[in-house]
Amino acid sequence: IILLGFIALLAVSCDKDDHLAPDKSKYVYDIPQTDLPVDAIVGAYYTNITSSSSWLKSGKKIYAGTPLLGEYLSTTSGVLQQQLAWADEAALDFLIVTWDAASADNTLITNFKSVRTATNAKVRLVINYNTKHLKVSNDKPLQEEENLNKMINDFTNTLVPLFNDEAYYKMNGRPVILITPSNLSSSALKSIDYSLVIPALKKAVSELGYDLYTIGEFTTGWVAPVNYEEHQIASFDGVTVNDWSTNMYDRYYAFFSFVDLNWANWKTTISKWNTDFVPCIFPSYNDRINSTSSYKYTFGQDGETADYINFCNVAKR
């Protein structure tokens, strides 16, 4: 009877239409030209190049063509001046600099402020605070007093003084700070509880006169927000996802509409926590130049302007 009932249920509940291919137009579609009623706030990641080896992999160049500034180091005279000039030409509001308590990080920040003042550049600075140097683990998580105090001391002793500088970017008076990573590795899921860490950090910084605007950085794209713990998203004022690699053919073939659907899902899902979604875009590139064994699909050797415009339109939606 159970077997017959199961078969009968299948016979009633199934319809041949259920097995037809989905409507392609729902998933693969063109992105329309999109205009914003006001100017967007725009920032860009800055890579601090501290070694000539950064331009090589296994002794071979990891780029094609000729860099306009050559195989530079960020500390090379004239480099930062030109980069800030380009940033102003592009109307960037800020450059994002990673800070992981390394001396090279502090040197770059010092140089940035100095060059900005000397050249009357307009672009400002935002810190991306990397928790790696805190060496937290499931057994010694960041929310434990000792580790949390280390993080707070990083801010009170080094980063908060930057907020006093006109060169640091503030949104409506609130210093913007990225904190990475929001996506914790599967072996370290208990190493950070952001629902405890971020309020404690904000409280400490507010006692020094600043209301932080925190952005959690997810370094892995294509993952739906429901796959993360609530604290990894809801603890922040905003979140950004910065890796949209075309590591599958479908993601390459329908890249812009797939990203559009993904971002719409992010915005809808996290709105219940009053968390902003901050889109992250990038020019197309050929990853096989960086790694001959790369399996990522590429849009073209040199990138196409039309592709970048499409990506910008996705972000503006």
What are these regions, as identified by a protein language model?
Residues 15-18:
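Bacterial signal peptide processing site
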Residues 10-13:
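C-terminal motif of bacterial Sec signal peptides marking the signal peptidase cleavage site
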Residues 20-317:
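Glycan-processing catalytic domains of CAZymes
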Residues 1-4:
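Sec-dependent signal peptide recognition
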